[in-house]
Amino acid sequence: EDIESRSQVKRTLCGNGQMVWHIWGEGVPIVFLHGGHGDWSHWCRNVEQIAAEGFKVIVADLPGLGASDDPGPPYTAEGIAEIVYYGITSLLPENSEIDLVGFSFGSVIGAVVAEKLDIRLKSFNVVGAAGFGPRERIANSMVKIHKAMSEQERIAAAQNNMRWLMLAHPENVGELATFMQLFNTDRARTLSRPISMTTRLLDALPNILAPVNAVWGELDRTVEGLSLIHISE
């Protein structure tokens, strides 16, 4: 199934270029922001199911990631969020209420967007959120992917990294996940990690007027159980 071919593609301003959005369905607007080194396909198993429930599913390629052009300076959560906010408000009528969902790096950008949306925001929902400040690194277990690698080495590195960082069960590290990871990594220009390591999401929480919902995986290595929840408290 070609999920992308069934979407409507829209473009909004992004630095000196364009930000790319994919849209499925009609109804209540819900906006999804993907994680670092990703694109809209982080949500590929969710978009059509959610659209079928009566939502207008609007999924970003964040600035400097996926098919979107580079954001230009400042390379901060605020600078990127301003572009995303402009895109959302360009795509939707002025009086639209919006549900916003962010994954990992996308939750940090989403927090700043949530502040800007003010009373238009219906809910802010984060999955595997970053933006709580520095956290224990697992870099020693990760393999840096570089141009000198053979294709087999690139595949092995990507699969190792997904097993450590993204997918707790090895059987889920299949051909589709590996292709997505390498394809998105090759296109990534925005350095998401420095932004993810800030406290920008934590700082934004008191300013977000809508209900906030958060979920982390029980086996999520980046948070070591409930450590980020304890920080937020």
Predicted features by range, described:
Residues 20-67:
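Conserved HGGG/HGGXW glycine-rich cap/lid loop of the alpha/beta-hydrolase fold
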Residues 1-11:
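An N-terminal hydrophobic leader/cap segment in hydrolases
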Residues 102, 106, 110:
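Gly/Ala-rich beta-loop-alpha elbow adjacent to hydrolase catalytic centers
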